Regions:
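Cytosolic-facing regulatory segments adjacent to core modules
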Residues: 1-76, 144, 184, 189-190
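Helical hairpin unit composed of two closely spaced alpha helices linked by a short loop
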Residues: 76-123
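C-terminal regions of RecA-like/P-loop NTPase motor modules
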Residues: 40-41, 60-77, 94-96, 114-119, ...
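Conserved H-loop
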Residues: 3, 125-128
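Flexible beta-alpha connector loops of hexameric P-loop NTPases
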Residues: 22-28, 50-56, 90-106, 133-142
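Generic enzyme active-site microenvironment
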Residues: 81, 126, 153
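Conserved RecA-like P-loop NTPase ATPase core
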Residues: 2, 49, 83, 112, ...
């Protein structure tokens, strides 16, 4: 919804091939083929990327796609990523309906959660913070943009937090905001490594979690 299929595929290629986005287009054909062969040897599974125009697709479109993939390709995903919730459409409210943003975003969240239950797969998406949340190093549910109906509907929410100190050591902080499946105070905060050039996230040592966990 936000990015072209090709741009998303490039990011995934950079991650899998362990090359930077900048170097991806300059890879010699032989090296490219070698990396592809290595990936095929060491991994399994299928990934399907589908692009929709911004604010035009809703849960019924995603449901139709899942059914089409099941019939034509015998494919059922293990997880569905939607980029991102706030620029989806609602199947209950038309774009020009006289409805406020609270109800509209809440409706989208409810429809996607319903689809997840129906298809028996997790659906992961993203949202943004309010203007004050952008400069807040301790983001909370109240910093969710547009509609508090979104965190009221979600089963699991976490915030990704960055600042100059974390950027200097190539890390981002993760804070659990809501968790219906476990105690959200367990591992409430932790850091993970990030390599933005290769679109990668990775674990960091326990020694780097000091003072963050459950604080």
């Amino acid at each position: 919804l936000e990015m072209a299929e090709e741009r998303i595929a490039e990011r995934i290629d950079a991650n899998l091939m362990n090359v930077s986005m900048e170097d991806l287009h300059d890879l010699p054909k032989s090296m490219y083929e070698s990396k592809i062969a290595q990936i095929q040897k060491n991994t399994s599974g299928e990934l399907i990327i589908k692009e929709y125009p911004t604010a035009s697709a809703h849960s019924a479109h995603f449901r139709g796609l899942l059914k089409e993939l099941a019939i034509k390709k015998s494919f059922k995903p293990d997880i569905l990523f939607i980029d991102y919730l706030n620029i989806c459409a609602s199947s209950r409210y038309k774009g020009q309906s006289n409805v406020n943003s609270y109800m509209y975003i809440k409706s989208i969240a409810e429809e996607l959660r319903g689809l997840a239950v129906e298809a028996n797969i997790p659906i992961m998406s993203a949202t943004q913070t309010t203007r004050s949340g952008f400069s807040n190093s301790d983001v909370g549910l109240e910093d969710t943009s547009e509609s508090f109906g979104l965190p009221a509907t979600a089963d699991l929410m976490f915030a990704l937090i960055s600042n100059e100190e974390l950027e200097a050591v190539n890390q981002i902080a993760v804070k659990q905001l809501k968790n219906r499946y476990n105690d959200p105070t367990m591992n409430k905060r932790f850091v993970i490594g990030i390599d933005r050039s290769k679109m990668r996230l990775m674990d960091v040592g326990e020694d780097q979690q000091t003072g963050l966990a459950d604080s």
